[in-house]
């Protein structure tokens, strides 16, 4: 069994923003799998499905980004999931728009949702998919990540989100190493 978590902020105000691409991937994956992510438990909206015969929980923490780890820890404890069976999907300003970086483990970098997750789990040894949202040339970083994509970025992001869903499926079916070889970039 896997828990697949997309990081984001709850509420319509944040829908479609750079910081919510993790939620976007969960929504796209849920659509592909024919389920809805609408049950509330462990401070998260979630839905259950199967990928390649493997049970998966798709989840969107409702705690706001900086406290995402609380929800993830509760889910992992409830379902008795080891860190290697957790996949976290989130935005990364240090990766160019439209690119993916898949890793087996690693630091949180500047991402507060990942800092919370690593702190709550007391480990950074879990797979993650970083979705590039780029970095502003100038201006406030907070306004940038809470802003929408430009007209030119939208097609790149649609392709990136689709590749991220395929990456999740590949991790579950083929393992992290094959997924990294196939989808990094």
Swiss-Prot record:
Q: What is this protein called in UniProt? A: Peptidyl-tRNA hydrolase
Q: What does this protein do?
A: Hydrolyzes ribosome-free peptidyl-tRNAs (with 1 or more amino acids incorporated), which drop off the ribosome during protein synthesis, or as a result of ribosome stalling. Catalyzes the release of premature peptidyl moieties from peptidyl-tRNA molecules trapped in stalled 50S ribosomal subunits, and thus maintains levels of free tRNAs and 50S ribosomes.
Q: Which EC numbers characterise this protein's activity in its record?
A: 3.1.1.29
- Marked site, Discriminates between blocked and unblocked aminoacyl-tRNA, at 9
Q: Cross-referenced InterPro entries, in alphabetical order?
A: Pept_tRNA_hydro, Pept_tRNA_hydro_CS, Pept_tRNA_hydro_sf
Encoding gene per record: pth
Q: What is the lineage of its organism?
A: Bacteria, Bacillati, Bacillota, Clostridia, Peptostreptococcales
Binding, tRNA: 14, 64, 66, 112
Q: How does it assemble?
A: Monomer.
One term of GO molecular function: peptidyl-tRNA hydrolase activity
Provenance organism: Alkaliphilus metalliredigens (strain QYMF)
The transmembrane residues are: none
Location in the cell:
Cytoplasm
Show the active-site residues.
Answer: 19
């Amino acid at each position: 069994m896997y828990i697949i978590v997309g990081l984001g902020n709850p509420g319509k105000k944040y829908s479609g923003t750079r910081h919510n691409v993790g939620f976007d991937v969960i929504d796209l994956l849920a659509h592909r799998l024919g389920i809805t992510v609408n049950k509330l438990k462990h401070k998260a909206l979630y839905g259950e499905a199967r990928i390649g015969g493997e049970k998966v929980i798709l989840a969107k923490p409702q705690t706001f980004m900086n406290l995402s780890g609380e929800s993830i820890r509760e889910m992992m404890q409830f379902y008795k999931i080891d860190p290697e069976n957790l996949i976290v999907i989130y935005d990364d300003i240090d990766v160019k728009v439209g690119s993916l970086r898949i890793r087996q483990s690693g630091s949180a970098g500047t991402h507060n949702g990942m800092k919370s997750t690593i702190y709550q789990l007391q480990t950074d040894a879990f797979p993650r998919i970083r979705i590039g949202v780029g970095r502003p040339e100038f201006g406030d970083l907070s306004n940038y990540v809470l802003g929408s994509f430009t007209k030119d970025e939208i097609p790149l992001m649609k392709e990136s989100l689709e590749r991220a869903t395929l990456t999740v499926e590949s991790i579950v079916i083929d393992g992290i190493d094959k997924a990294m070889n196939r989808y990094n970039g």
